[in-house]
């Protein structure tokens, strides 16, 4: 029996194909690192390009590290909203645990107003935890912070006076939270990295699930897709299409893509890995991840074929390609966006239709 999440399998045009960035600080063509301010403006320029090329959605992630210039995605999305007309604008993710749900809702409702109803939010617990000490939160409260704040956010989505009480923020009594969205709804996803408990929580709240598949064979996430679908069926909550986000890079040839991406990717991965106890990344591991794992790197045809195979295997309804990694050249990033919009997206749809 078909499932509501499977509608794109019969209609590839329903598949949402997007781009994702953390606002990595790039280099110019002479190899000079841009300032944070210039890096943020570069994200806006790339979003404008993507909008004109028919990319469905642009997601901007929140981080609080020197490698990434964007700490408040919704502020960048608001700027993008005023220069674009059709592309959907999403966070990827917003770290709800170290933020206030009321303020998050208000900020994204404002982006929704500026964009004419194109705003989406992906809520996450935070795989990078720099925001917790920065904003005065205890990592020991990691679970309860997200659980309670997500519960409040779901109530805010009903867009009526809210009464709520928990342990992580002051209570609300018939609170009016403004602005309201024109449509009466705000598309909301929960970012999931591979925890069954996170999958069940997302299903219980009736929200869409966005899988962060950043390493290893993507097929290993099939049980989480199945669990989400079974849970929504059993709980009677809305059955949303499942989304996924994976890193990758598009260039004119496979060799160019692999060589351009390798050094910036290795540098940022090793910098983070050193803090988490990971060994340095070897070139053989990088190549293996491209061939059999979750790096979508190569020419438009190579990337499109791998994306289509993953979409077909997992049955996802949205695929966001994280196309920035460390200090890539600005010109290479612009070319990647161009190739993704003009070649990869049409190829993926054709492959799935066939």
Show the residue positions of the predicted features.
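An alpha-helical appendage that flanks or caps ligand/catalytic pockets
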Residues: 2, 8-13, 19, 143-177, ...
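Hydrophobic faces of well-ordered beta-strands that scaffold small-molecule active sites
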Residues: 17-21, 58-60, 89-91, 119-123, ...
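Conserved, mostly hydrophobic/aromatic
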Residues: 17, 54, 62, 80, ...
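N-terminal beta1-alpha1-beta2 module of alpha/beta enzyme domains
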Residues: 1-88
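Internal, glycine-rich beta/alpha segment that forms the wall or movable "lid"
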Residues: 3-15, 19, 29, 100-207, ...
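Structural motif
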Residues: 53, 114, 205, 313-314
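Short, acidic/polar
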Residues: 37-49, 193-200, 302-309
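Active-site mouth loops of central-metabolism enzymes
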Residues: 25-40, 94-102, 184-194, 291-300
């Amino acid at each position: 029996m078909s499932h509501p999440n499977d509608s794109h399998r019969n209609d590839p045009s329903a598949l949402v194909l997007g781009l994702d960035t953390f606002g990595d600080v790039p280099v110019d063509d002479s190899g000079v690192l841009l300032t944070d301010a210039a890096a943020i403006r570069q994200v806006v320029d790339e979003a404008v390009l993507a909008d004109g090329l028919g990319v469905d959605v642009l997601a901007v992630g929140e981080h609080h590290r020197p490698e990434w210039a964007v700490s408040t995605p919704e502020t960048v999305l608001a700027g993008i909203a005023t220069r674009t007309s059709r592309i959907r604008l999403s966070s990827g993710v917003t770290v709800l645990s170290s933020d206030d749900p009321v303020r998050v809702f208000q900020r994204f409702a404002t982006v929704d107003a500026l964009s004419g109803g194109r705003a989406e939010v992906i809520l996450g617990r935070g795989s990078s935890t720099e925001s917790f000490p920065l904003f005065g939160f205890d990592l020991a409260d990691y679970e309860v912070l997200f659980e309670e704040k997500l519960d409040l956010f779901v109530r805010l989505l009903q867009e009526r006076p809210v009464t709520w009480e928990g342990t992580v923020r002051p209570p609300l009594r018939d609170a009016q939270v403004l602005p309201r969205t024109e449509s009466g709804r705000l598309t909301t996803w929960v970012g999931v990295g591979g925890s069954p408990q996170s999958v069940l929580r997302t299903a219980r709240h009736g929200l869409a699930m966005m899988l962060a598949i950043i390493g290893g064979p993507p097929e290993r996430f099939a049980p989480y897709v199945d669990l989400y679908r079974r849970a929504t069926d059993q709980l009677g909550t809305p059955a949303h299409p499942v989304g996924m986000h994976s890193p990758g890079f598009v260039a004119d040839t496979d060799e160019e893509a692999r060589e351009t991406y390798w050094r910036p990717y290795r540098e940022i991965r090793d910098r983070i890995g050193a803090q988490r106890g990971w060994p340095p990344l070897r070139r053989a591991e990088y190549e293996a991840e491209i061939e059999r794992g979750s790096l979508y790197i190569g020419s438009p045809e190579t990337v499109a074929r791998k994306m289509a195979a993953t979409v077909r295997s997992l049955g996802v309804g949205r695929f966001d390609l994280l196309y920035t990694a460390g200090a890539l050249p600005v010109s290479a990033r612009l070319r990647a966006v161009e190739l993704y919009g003009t070649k990869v997206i049409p190829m993926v749809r054709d492959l799935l239709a066939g």
